[in-house]
């Protein structure tokens, strides 16, 4: 089954209910939300989610486990100086997700800053191990997102993501493949068979449980991270459609994070375009 949706807003007054209502209107069967603004860690009480109303009206169309949660961008679990805050916040975020039976938490791996890459990857692994200890009774899984290599980002290669997965050794840790990010990091999606073979050869394919499907405004290997609308960037519609329809990605939530136009988001048009055979 193809699972295709988008990032949708999560805001007052109806929070989750309106998020999923919008997703269904767009023709989606999965969705991604932030449980607050992407740039901060403020959170509302679970009672405001309108969760029971969502279950009653929409859970037959988009199940709780097909609602992906994205962690705030400002969290840096790879930082030797800021890891304690990341551990505390992400542990609390997982407990919030447990209440709603959400399954996947997408996490940017973080930045190495003034430290070196290996020390930061080791810190990231320690942070995740600690989070899993604190939330040992949880079913929530953390998905480390593949990054573009902008600035001092860690997670810019499959090997860096796999290094952390291998150190943590938990079935609760996997990967989120972002097409714009891997393109900007130097993985050529336009040579689709080579791209796919590398996913298999490196061993990361079996860990991918969420996909962010975005076109890119920049050249291959640019390390920029600038998303483009579907078929408006340098990856192009053909190869993004190949990902959507490839059986190896069956039943994986595929989430659009493409830019808004002057008239607002066009996720409905992009979803329809991608589902067309």
Curated annotation (Swiss-Prot):
Catalyzed reaction equations: Endonucleolytic cleavage to 5'-phosphooligonucleotide end-products
A GO biological-process term: base-excision repair
Cofactor: Zn(2+)
Record's keyword terms, sorted: DNA damage, DNA repair, Endonuclease, Hydrolase, Metal-binding, Nuclease, Zinc
Cofactor info, note text: Binds 3 Zn(2+) ions.
Residues bound to Zn(2+) 1: 70, 108, 145
Cross-referenced HAMAP family: Nfo
Function according to Swiss-Prot or TrEMBL: Endonuclease IV plays a role in DNA repair. It cleaves phosphodiester bonds at apurinic or apyrimidinic (AP) sites, generating a 3'-hydroxyl group and a 5'-terminal sugar phosphate.
Protein name: Probable endonuclease 4
Organism for this UniProt entry: Mycoplasmopsis pulmonis (strain UAB CTIP) (Mycoplasma pulmonis)
């Amino acid at each position: 089954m193809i699972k295709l949706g988008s990032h949708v807003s999560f805001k007052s007054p109806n929070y989750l209910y309106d998020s999923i209502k919008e997703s269904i209107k767009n023709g989606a069967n999965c969705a991604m939300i932030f449980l607050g603004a992407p740039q901060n860690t403020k959170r509302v009480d679970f009672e405001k989610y309108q969760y029971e109303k969502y279950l009653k009206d929409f859970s037959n169309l988009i199940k709780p486990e097909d609602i992906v949660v994205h962690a705030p961008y400002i969290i840096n679990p790879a930082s030797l100086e800021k890891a304690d805050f990341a551990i505390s916040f992400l542990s609390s975020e997982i407990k919030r997700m447990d209440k709603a039976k959400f399954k996947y938490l997408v996490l940017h791996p973080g930045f190495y800053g003034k430290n070196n890459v290996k020390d930061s990857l080791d810190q990231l692994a320690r942070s995740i191990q600690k989070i899993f200890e604190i939330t040992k009774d949880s079913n929530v899984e953390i998905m480390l997102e593949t990054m573009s290599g902008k600035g001092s980002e860690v997670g810019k290669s499959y090997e860096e993501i796999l290094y952390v997965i291998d150190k943590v050794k938990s079935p609760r840790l996997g990967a989120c493949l972002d097409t714009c990010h891997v393109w900007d990091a130097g993985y050529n999606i336009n040579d689709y068979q080579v791209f796919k073979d590398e996913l298999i050869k490196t061993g990361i394919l079996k860990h991918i449980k969420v996909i962010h499907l975005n076109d890119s405004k920049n050249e291959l290997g640019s390390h920029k991270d600038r998303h483009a609308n579907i078929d408006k960037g340098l990856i192009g519609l053909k190869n993004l459609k190949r990902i959507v329809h490839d059986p190896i990605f069956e039943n994986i939530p595929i989430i659009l994070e493409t830019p808004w136009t002057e008239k607002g988001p066009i996720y409905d048009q992009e979803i329809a375009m991608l589902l067309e055979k």
